Regions:
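Acyl-donor-binding surface of acyltransferase catalytic domains
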Residues: 72-79, 84-162, 167-168, 308-312
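Active-site/acyl-donor-binding loops of N-acyltransferases
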Residues: 131-151, 217, 266, 275-320
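Short amphipathic alpha-helix that is part of the acyltransferase structural core
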Residues: 1-43, 155-197
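Conserved acetyl-CoA-binding loop-helix of GNAT-fold acetyltransferases
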Residues: 90-104, 248-251, 257-274, 279, ...
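Hydrophobic adenine-recognition pocket in adenosine-nucleotide-binding enzymes
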Residues: 10, 84, 249-251
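Phosphate-binding active sites in nucleotide-utilizing proteins
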Residues: 183-242, 246-249, 253, 262
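Conserved donor-binding loop and adjoining core beta-sheet/short helix segment
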Residues: 22-119, 223, 228-242
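Conserved hydrophobic/aromatic pocket- or pore-lining residues that grip, position, or stack substrates
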Residues: 176, 221, 268
Length: 320
């Protein structure tokens, strides 16, 4: 492979090769490859981002060997995504991509912190990020259960709770958003999103993705007059396997401690298994203060290291 590496903005002509590139990266560190062309389009054309300024493609010998892009996440954070092909490590590509992202982030939001995510299995990432001034701030694990381990027992709901699907009750969309805000208030890393942002991120940006938006899999716990809990599920179907994912689960504070969280998890498992999932996963912050880890383990899930979130603060002179 040539030592000459060109870095240029991403374009729509890169969609298919970028898809193949990212699948090669995730296959090494996760054992799966499920990026789709729609995922790449969503990355390049994320709302508010300019591919000519906010994406970087590293090319050597006509092949993509690195990719990075960044976007504003609220007024105080810029998120970065950067990957180097497993066979192109050790050539400084990752450092160049991160430097370009940092420079662009400083132009975009000079006072904002920068965050990025790395897979725990990527042993080379920590040294690179620390050299670039990043520090680890949060660790996540992926909880997993095989479909064969899901309990056959019917879900037992707390008194007065009815489970409904968003697809059957679209009129509850606003109530779901209100419950989501209440359930995640104060949680680390949660930005207060407007209702429009909530739906853009979870519905519109999912069109054509490996884990598409399916309102039939959005399960709501309904008490008289309000949504008090929710479990937003997704299903990825491929030739290799079908993976169910609990993307978000929450219970409003006033309803915690009564078994509603366990009922939602159990019901989601049964629902995803019934849709053909061979295994079910969800990601959880190891510092979660709502006893989430214990809840998922009590439901039969097994934890394994997943990813780390890194942060870089702007230079002090920028703040003055």
């Amino acid at each position: 492979m040539s030592q000459l590496v060109e870095i240029r903005p991403g374009t729509d002509a890169d969609v298919i090769p970028l898809c193949e590139f990212l699948n090669a990266c995730t296959l090494v560190h996760q054992g799966v490859s499920r990026s789709s062309a729609a995922d790449i389009v969503a990355r390049l054309h994320r709302e508010g981002a300019d591919p000519q300024l906010d994406s970087f493609v590293a090319v050597a010998d006509g092949a993509i060997v690195g990719f990075a892009h960044l976007w504003a996440h609220g007024p105080d954070e810029v998120k970065l995504f950067a990957r180097t092909h497993p066979e192109a490590r050790g050539r400084g590509i990752g450092s160049r991509l991160l430097s370009l992202c940092d420079r662009r982030a400083a132009e975009l939001l000079p006072r904002a912190q920068r965050t990025t995510t790395t897979w725990t299995a990527d042993a080379s990432a920590p040294a690179l990020l620390e050299f670039q001034g990043y520090r680890p701030i949060r660790y996540f694990v992926t909880m997993e259960i095989g479909a064969g381990s899901v309990s056959e027992q019917a879900t037992v709901w707390p008194a007065g709770i009815e489970r409904v699907r968003l697809s059957r009750r679209p009129d509850l969309a606003g109530a779901l958003y209100a419950a989501w805000k209440e359930a995640f208030a104060g949680h680390w890393g949660r930005q207060v999103e407007s209702e429009a942002e909530f739906w853009t991120e979870r519905r519109d940006a999912k069109i054509g993705s490996a884990f598409p938006f399916e309102p039939e899999l959005w399960l709501l716990a309904l008490a008289p007059g309000e949504v008090v809990g929710f479990c937003l599920c997704e299903l990825s179907v491929s030739d290799a396997e079908s993976v169910g994912r609990v993307a978000e689960i929450g219970v409003v504070p006033a309803r915690r401690g009564a078994g509603l969280g366990f009922a939602l998890v159990h019901d989601a498992f049964r629902e995803l298994r019934g849709r053909g999932a061979t295994r079910i996963v969800l990601d959880v912050d190891v510092e979660n203060t709502t006893s989430a880890l214990r809840l998922y383990q009590s439901a039969g899930m097994i934890p394994r290291p997943a990813f780390t979130i890194w942060e870089k603060r702007p230079s002090p002179h920028v703040l003055h």
